[in-house]
């Protein structure tokens, strides 16, 4: 055993010795590398001396102190050699070295554990440590600028990593702290240099993590050189060369071309652990020679841009335009998005994807690629040429227009308007193109056209500006002017960009776009005439801002036939809808026709200016398309009747322009798009008064997931939506209306709900302004994800009737027009809305929609005149005021609506408004909401189609949740009330309990801030058996709590 143990000890000792030898070898190797590097660096500076000095053996030559003093003299510019005394005596050498060290200390270079004796003896570790501190302080720290001269310098020994082993003085706590501080400062300076190197090499795909192993391949050196002069290095070739070749090439190029001294050799780097300090010393020379590169943070755009991308500066277009067209292919499918961001003026830039797929993406027809794919490059170049040349009428068909894929081909010219002057973002999907042919044409026909790009782009950008202005209705005048300019330009250019490409769009829907886009110049006069004080006349489908023609093809955004299209539609599509809604509001303010709003929609699809979430629209897409037809039909009923007739008229005028082949596709699409297309057609029929509504309704095509965000607010303002036919039409949604596509409720459904309930809701909005309205919109967003299906079904099932009179007033911009024509629209709505609704909506929706719209119109009519348009708008804008007004008017409204025999109470109105607005959540304080809905159950069955019945369960759940929240709130209020009751009230408690109803109402008044529900709401609340029992229980509980203390007192 002893022998074995002995052998084990010997073996361990041998292993330890071998390890020590390896460490020593590494240490010696590092010292040798540092010695060579530092010697070269010192000689580099000593050459400046007069006479020049040279170091052959650093450890020997530095012992007399002359080399050290000469080096410091060159680096600092101060005279030190005059103090040098040459002598062979050690004492004189120590004196020379001490003077040099004293100078360093005076220069705030704090040296740790380095004394003159060690330097005079030639201690390798301390000599290298001294030189490294000099390099770090006089070169690296000054270059990086991290540490000022006033801060102490770091003193890290180079190779050994410590100096105490060779120091004659043992380290003290103070010395250790100094070392720690020095190391920290050194790391900071090196880190700064590393950051500079990383910025220089990042764009070449070289990852530099440190100053050691990252440089072994030589690519980092080459990348730094290439950052300074790209012509000196070929990185592709470097990837194929060996490490030695790369290192040799880097050092040679740096020396020969950049005049950077060759401090390193390939052998110094081609080791397992390259010396960090040597590499830092060498790399710092690049920063020293080329300091102008230090602040450079930008990356070469040519290197960063994708290979397939091209940037084109449109100098001719105004900066305001900021047209940016981006064509992208998604998921291998030919899905393309054209973005023109004009909400804020970005630099005029056109981003065109050179991939062949992108052109095919433009062809949204049933044929996925068609001929556009073949001419993708040509298409890109043509678009760019058009943009640069500014040829207004020249949009050579890049791809031959196919019968179905002729979405880009203009109806007149028979050529595709592939030009990209898009006002807003457009998303095209190859699969969607069948149904989303509308989106194709609107964007490409008039919006994407770069014909006379300066003009077209300017106009388009102006329209985009319109859309952004639509978001801000306050800038109505400015947006009107821009819209007019855009409309005029669009009318000039739109004719070429026909909606024929809108294969999926129904002829009615397409005609509106076609007439506005294809025949924009021809129809623009009529449209303008129609638009005039009212919206565009039914005869023309073009959208006009006042006297100008704004042609917007929103149909492009919605593929109607396939429900899956919405799923495929990128987030930008939803954005597009959202933008369209905003633009609709703006266009309405400008008195633009729905077509113009649609156009903006198409443009806005990709724009991210609006609050609508792309994801929401996406989620909406599949169901939205399926239910879109049904729900849209119903909502269209509710949509302001005047709007629909105009849309119908426009739609009818447009169908001749649109190819019949596209009609079938368009029909389903139209159902989803019909809201806006209907609105446009109906709006044309009732152009005088329903142009605004028309714009509003079509602007939010359900399937297109056109944002109806503004739908709600407009409805509150009293927008009149006639039941729009299922066929797609061009329309502009007032920017007050907010439609959240994540609710799968079709746009048409919401719009028609507004149309039928227009009058009722109008009076309700003006008189009662339920807190529910504003609250519903907020809750809609909050519960969007949870209640997408419910909300969609509720919107489709629950058609809300907005006051017809309010349709124009609701649009803030239309208010001026409405003033003259508000009565006309109202009168027209009565007769015109049902016909238009019947024409375009499915039979069921036609029947139900007109009836409900008429009924809803009748009760609200008395109050509509009472409420001025401005007041309605104001109420819509201020949800809080609406809540209070509605609370106070709840009682009055219930009487009003009950009088006609419709059994509509303020609750019913509230329910309608909530449904109309996709009620995701009712206000906590409004007790009448729940009761109202139950009382109107029969009305829902009578007036709403089977779709509404299908969603009854969802509505009940919502009501129950609202009731529960209300009950909890009431309980809180009661508790607070009882806590506030005084002692004398305790004695009178029994009496108060007997008069529970009176107490309840009074109790509402007692707590400040808890009086949110109106008295009649409380009465209705009390009338419910469950609520009454619950309140009785609470009263009994409080009574017992109050009685027990008295019993205790009597016992005492």
UniProtKB/Swiss-Prot annotation:
<keyword id="KW-0963">Cytoplasm</keyword>
<dbReference type="InterPro" id="IPR047826">
    <property type="entry name" value="CLMN_CH_second"/>
</dbReference>
<keyword id="KW-0472">Membrane</keyword>
<feature type="compositionally biased region" description="Basic and acidic residues">
    <location>
        <begin position="711"/>
        <end position="720"/>
    </location>
</feature>
<feature type="compositionally biased region" description="Polar residues">
    <location>
        <begin position="509"/>
        <end position="529"/>
    </location>
</feature>
<feature type="compositionally biased region" description="Basic and acidic residues">
    <location>
        <begin position="455"/>
        <end position="465"/>
    </location>
</feature>
<feature type="compositionally biased region" description="Acidic residues">
    <location>
        <begin position="780"/>
        <end position="791"/>
    </location>
</feature>
<feature type="compositionally biased region" description="Basic and acidic residues">
    <location>
        <begin position="622"/>
        <end position="651"/>
    </location>
</feature>
<keyword id="KW-0812">Transmembrane</keyword>
<dbReference type="GO" id="GO:0005737">
    <property type="term" value="C:cytoplasm"/>
</dbReference>
<dbReference type="InterPro" id="IPR047827">
    <property type="entry name" value="CLMN_CH_first"/>
</dbReference>
<feature type="region of interest" description="Disordered">
    <location>
        <begin position="758"/>
        <end position="929"/>
    </location>
</feature>
<feature type="compositionally biased region" description="Basic and acidic residues">
    <location>
        <begin position="759"/>
        <end position="773"/>
    </location>
</feature>
<feature type="compositionally biased region" description="Basic and acidic residues">
    <location>
        <begin position="659"/>
        <end position="669"/>
    </location>
</feature>
<protein>
    <recommendedName>
        <fullName>Calmin</fullName>
    </recommendedName>
</protein>
<feature type="modified residue" description="Phosphoserine">
    <location>
        <position position="925"/>
    </location>
</feature>
<dbReference type="InterPro" id="IPR052403">
    <property type="entry name" value="LINC-complex_assoc"/>
</dbReference>
<feature type="region of interest" description="Disordered">
    <location>
        <begin position="455"/>
        <end position="545"/>
    </location>
</feature>
<dbReference type="GO" id="GO:0003779">
    <property type="term" value="F:actin binding"/>
</dbReference>
<feature type="compositionally biased region" description="Basic and acidic residues">
    <location>
        <begin position="472"/>
        <end position="495"/>
    </location>
</feature>
<feature type="compositionally biased region" description="Basic and acidic residues">
    <location>
        <begin position="594"/>
        <end position="614"/>
    </location>
</feature>
<feature type="modified residue" description="Phosphoserine">
    <location>
        <position position="724"/>
    </location>
</feature>
<feature type="region of interest" description="Actin-binding">
    <location>
        <begin position="1"/>
        <end position="288"/>
    </location>
</feature>
<keyword id="KW-0597">Phosphoprotein</keyword>
<feature type="compositionally biased region" description="Basic and acidic residues">
    <location>
        <begin position="836"/>
        <end position="849"/>
    </location>
</feature>
<feature type="transmembrane region" description="Helical; Anchor for type IV membrane protein">
    <location>
        <begin position="1027"/>
        <end position="1047"/>
    </location>
</feature>
<feature type="modified residue" description="Phosphoserine">
    <location>
        <position position="537"/>
    </location>
</feature>
<feature type="compositionally biased region" description="Low complexity">
    <location>
        <begin position="148"/>
        <end position="168"/>
    </location>
</feature>
<feature type="compositionally biased region" description="Low complexity">
    <location>
        <begin position="792"/>
        <end position="801"/>
    </location>
</feature>
<dbReference type="GO" id="GO:0031175">
    <property type="term" value="P:neuron projection development"/>
</dbReference>
<keyword id="KW-0677">Repeat</keyword>
<feature type="compositionally biased region" description="Basic residues">
    <location>
        <begin position="880"/>
        <end position="889"/>
    </location>
</feature>
<feature type="modified residue" description="Phosphoserine">
    <location>
        <position position="856"/>
    </location>
</feature>
<dbReference type="InterPro" id="IPR001589">
    <property type="entry name" value="Actinin_actin-bd_CS"/>
</dbReference>
<feature type="region of interest" description="Disordered">
    <location>
        <begin position="391"/>
        <end position="420"/>
    </location>
</feature>
<feature type="region of interest" description="Disordered">
    <location>
        <begin position="148"/>
        <end position="178"/>
    </location>
</feature>
<feature type="domain" description="Calponin-homology (CH) 2">
    <location>
        <begin position="187"/>
        <end position="291"/>
    </location>
</feature>
<dbReference type="Pfam" id="PF00307">
    <property type="entry name" value="CH"/>
</dbReference>
<dbReference type="GO" id="GO:0008285">
    <property type="term" value="P:negative regulation of cell population proliferation"/>
</dbReference>
<feature type="domain" description="Calponin-homology (CH) 1">
    <location>
        <begin position="32"/>
        <end position="139"/>
    </location>
</feature>
<feature type="modified residue" description="Phosphothreonine">
    <location>
        <position position="710"/>
    </location>
</feature>
<keyword id="KW-0009">Actin-binding</keyword>
């Amino acid at each position: 055993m002893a022998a074995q143990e002995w052998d084990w000890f010997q073996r361990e000792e041998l292993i330890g010795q071998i390890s020590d030898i390896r460490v020593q070898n590494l240490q010696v190797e590092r010292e040798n590398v540092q010695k060579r590097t530092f010697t070269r660096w010192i000689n580099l500076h000593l050459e400046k001396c007069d006479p020049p000095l040279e170091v052959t053996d650093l450890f020997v030559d530095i012992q007399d102190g002359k080399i050290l003093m000469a080096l410091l003299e060159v680096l600092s510019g101060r005279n030190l050699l005059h103090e040098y005394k040459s002598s062979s005596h050690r004492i004189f050498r120590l004196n020379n070295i001490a003077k040099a060290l004293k100078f360093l200390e005076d220069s705030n270079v704090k040296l740790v554990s380095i004394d003159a004796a060690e330097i005079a003896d030639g201690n390798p570790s301390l000599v290298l440590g001294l030189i490294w501190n000099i390099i770090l302080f006089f070169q690296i720290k000054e270059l990086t600028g991290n540490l000022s001269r006033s801060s102490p310098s770091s003193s890290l020994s180079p190779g050994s990593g410590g100096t105490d082993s060779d120091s004659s003085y043992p380290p003290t706590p103070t010395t250790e702290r100094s070392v720690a501080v020095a190391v920290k400062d050194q790391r900071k300076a090196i880190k700064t240099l590393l950051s500079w190197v990383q910025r220089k090499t990042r764009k070449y795909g070289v990852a530099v993590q440190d100053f050691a192993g990252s440089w072994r391949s030589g690519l980092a050196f080459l990348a730094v050189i290439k950052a300074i002069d790209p012509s000196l290095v070929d990185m592709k070739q470097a990837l194929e060369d060996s490490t030695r070749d790369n290192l040799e090439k880097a050092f040679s190029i740096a020396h020969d071309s950049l005049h950077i001294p060759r401090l390193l050799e390939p052998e110094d780097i081609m080791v397992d652990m390259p010396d960090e300090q040597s590499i830092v010393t060498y790399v710092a020379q690049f920063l020293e020679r080329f300091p102008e590169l230090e602040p450079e943070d930008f990356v070469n755009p040519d290197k960063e841009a994708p290979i397939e991308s091209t940037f084109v500066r449109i100098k001719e277009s105004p900066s305001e335009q900021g047209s940016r067209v981006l064509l992208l292919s998604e998921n291998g499918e030919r899905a393309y998005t054209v973005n023109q961001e004009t909400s804020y003026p970005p630099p005029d830039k056109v981003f065109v994807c050179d991939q062949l797929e992108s052109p095919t993406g433009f062809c949204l027809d049933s044929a996925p690629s068609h001929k556009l794919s073949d001419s993708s490059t040509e298409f890109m170049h043509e678009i760019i040429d058009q943009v640069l040349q500014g040829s207004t009428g020249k949009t050579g068909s890049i791809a031959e227009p196919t019968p179905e894929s002729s979405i880009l081909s203009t109806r007149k010219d028979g050529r595709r308007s592939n030009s990209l002057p898009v006002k807003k973002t457009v998303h095209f999907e190859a699969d969607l193109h069948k149904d989303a042919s509308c989106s194709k044409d609107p964007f490409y026909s008039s919006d994407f056209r770069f014909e006379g790009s300066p003009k077209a782009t300017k106009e388009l950008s102006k329209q985009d500006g319109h859309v952004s202005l639509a978001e801000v209705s306050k800038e109505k005048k400015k947006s009107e002017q821009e819209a007019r300019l855009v409309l005029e330009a669009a009318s000039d250019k739109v004719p070429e960009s026909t909606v024929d490409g809108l294969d999926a769009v129904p002829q009615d829907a397409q005609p509106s776009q076609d007439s506005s886009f294809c025949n924009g110049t021809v129809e623009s006069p009529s449209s303008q005439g129609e638009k005039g004080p009212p919206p565009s006349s039914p005869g023309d489908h073009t959208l006009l801002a006042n006297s100008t023609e704004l042609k917007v093809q929103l149909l492009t955004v919605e593929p109607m036939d396939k429900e899956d299209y919405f799923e495929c539609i990128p987030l930008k599509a939803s954005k597009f809808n959202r933008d369209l809604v905003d633009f609709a509001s703006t266009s309405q303010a400008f008195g633009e026709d729905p077509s113009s709003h649609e156009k903006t929609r198409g443009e806005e699809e990709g724009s991210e200016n609006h609050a609508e979430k792309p994801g929401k629209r996406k989620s909406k897409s599949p169901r939205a398309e399926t239910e879109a037809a049904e729900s849209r039909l119903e909502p269209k009923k509710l949509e302001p009747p005047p709007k629909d007739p105009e849309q119908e008229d426009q739609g009818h005028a447009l169908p001749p322009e649109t190819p019949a082949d596209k009609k079938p596709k368009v029909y389903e699409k139209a159902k989803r798009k019909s809201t806006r297309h209907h609105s446009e057609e109906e709006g044309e029929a009732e152009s005088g008064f329903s142009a605004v509504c028309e714009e509003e309704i079509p602007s939010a095509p359900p399937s297109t997931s056109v944002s109806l965000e503004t739908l709600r607010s407009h409805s509150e303002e009293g927008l009149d939506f006639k039941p729009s036919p299922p066929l797609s039409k061009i329309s502009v949604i007032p920017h007050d209306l907010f439609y959240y596509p994540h609710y799968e409720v079709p746009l048409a459904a919401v719009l028609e709900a507004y149309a039928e309930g227009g009058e009722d809701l109008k009076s309700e909005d003006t008189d009662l302004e339920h807190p529910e309205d504003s609250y519903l919109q907020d809750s809609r967003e909050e519960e969007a994800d949870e209640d997408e299906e419910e909300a969609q079904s509720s919107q489709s099932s629950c058609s809300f009737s907005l006051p017809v009179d309010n349709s124009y007033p609701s649009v803030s911009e239309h208010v001026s027009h409405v003033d003259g024509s508000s009565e006309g629209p109202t009168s027209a709505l009565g007769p015109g809305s049902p016909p238009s609704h019947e024409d375009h909506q499915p039979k069921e929706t036609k029947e139900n929609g007109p009836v409900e719209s008429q009924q809803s119109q009748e009760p609200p009519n008395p109050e509509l005149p009472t409420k001025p348009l401005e007041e309605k708008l104001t109420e819509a804008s201020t949800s809080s005021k609406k809540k209070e007004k509605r609370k106070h008017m709840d009682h009055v409204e219930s009487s009003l609506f009950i009088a006609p025999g419709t059994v509509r109470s303020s609750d019913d109105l509230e329910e309608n408004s909530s449904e109309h607005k996709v009620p995701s959540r009712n206000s906590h304080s409004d007790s009448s909401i729940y009761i109202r809905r139950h009382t109107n159950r029969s009305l829902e069955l009578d007036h709403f189609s089977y779709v509404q019945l299908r969603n009854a369960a969802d509505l009940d759940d919502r009501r129950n949740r609202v009731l529960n929240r209300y009950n909890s709130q009431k309980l809180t209020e009661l508790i607070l009330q009882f806590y506030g009751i005084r002692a004398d009230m305790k004695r009178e408690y029994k009496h108060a309990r007997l008069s529970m109803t009176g107490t309840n109402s009074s109790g509402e008044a007692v707590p400040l801030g808890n009086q949110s529900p109106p008295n009649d709401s409380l009465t209705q609340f009390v009338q419910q058996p469950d609520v009454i029992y619950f309140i009785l229980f609470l009263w009994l509980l409080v009574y017992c709590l109050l009685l027990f203390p008295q019993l205790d007192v009597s016992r005492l």
